[in-house]
């Protein structure tokens, strides 16, 4: 497998994350909640589940495709570190409700999205 392909996919994922996050966070209403980070993480969970189901469950794609797209593109598209920084920032400014909602929704919907993607990809 080519590390270059993983790097190119990672670069594309990072740019996609930046564009999606900027588009969502740049909408009217300010940034009281980190919707951009939330959206890319939920979408990435769904897509990684789908990709895994298509590779493992159905065998429609080569395992190398899962590595390039999963570790490369989706690894750069999603962002655990920014999510944690957003949680820390909400706690630092005393907005415990926003931190709790972010943690609960991101975790719960992220798991649900991954499960749904896996079920769709697997064909169950």
Swiss-Prot record:
GO molecular function: fluoride channel activity; metal ion binding
Keyword terms of this UniProt record: Cell membrane, Ion channel, Ion transport, Membrane, Metal-binding, Sodium, Transmembrane, Transmembrane helix, Transport
GO BP annotations, alphabetical order: cellular detoxification of fluoride
Record's subcellular location: Cell membrane
GO cellular component: plasma membrane
Function of the molecule: Fluoride-specific ion channel. Important for reducing fluoride concentration in the cell, thus reducing its toxicity.
Catalytic activity: fluoride(in) = fluoride(out)
Protein name: Fluoride-specific ion channel FluC 1
Pfam families found in the cross-reference section: CRCB (PF02537)
Entry similarity comment: Belongs to the fluoride channel Fluc/FEX (TC 1.A.43) family.
Protein's membrane topology: Multi-pass membrane protein
Transport in keyword set: yes
Protein source organism: Symbiobacterium thermophilum (strain DSM 24528 / JCM 14929 / IAM 14863 / T)
Residues passing through the membrane, by range: 4-24, 36-56, 67-87, 103-123
Regulation: Na(+) is not transported, but it plays an essential structural role and its presence is essential for fluoride channel function.
Superkingdom of the organism of origin: Bacteria
Record-listed Na(+) binding positions: 75, 78
